[in-house]
Amino acid sequence: MKLKFSQLAKAVLCTAAMAVSALGSMTISASAADNINVDIVCKNDTTTVSNAEWSIYKVGERKEADFVLTGEFSDYPIDMSDFTDASKMQAVADTLDNYAKTDGITPVSTGKTDANGEVKLSADSVGLYLVSGKSFENTTAKFTPSPSLIEIDKDIVAEKV
């Protein structure tokens, strides 16, 4: 069952140099088998991006109205208390993505888009996740994903089929 995004979830933007338009969407769903899926689609009417590498990292959890970093991200000096606008949220996503790549943090799930531009990643529990894609070029386009933060909350898990 496809479920709503929380207020922190936002669409993953995939840009193609030739198309100069946003490609992509992201859907969060939960199944009866306690699996939380993050489905990423990288295509529009004219362009499909296959073999795009994606990873998700659990970076934090909600603590009352704010988020706190957890796990391997807990010691990073990042202010998680002010997500009042998209630019601040994007700055945090960019910073966490840089830390994850620089420090070699192991993602919760990884995958590559198939011939239809689709990939299904798995999350292990409720929390704040970083969705990160790897840049690459093929013969027709340059793929440069923007890291995003999504919250998988208890309501998404509770509403599973």
PLM regions: where:
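Solvent-exposed loop/turn and edge beta-strand elements of beta-rich ligand-binding domains
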Residues: 2-161
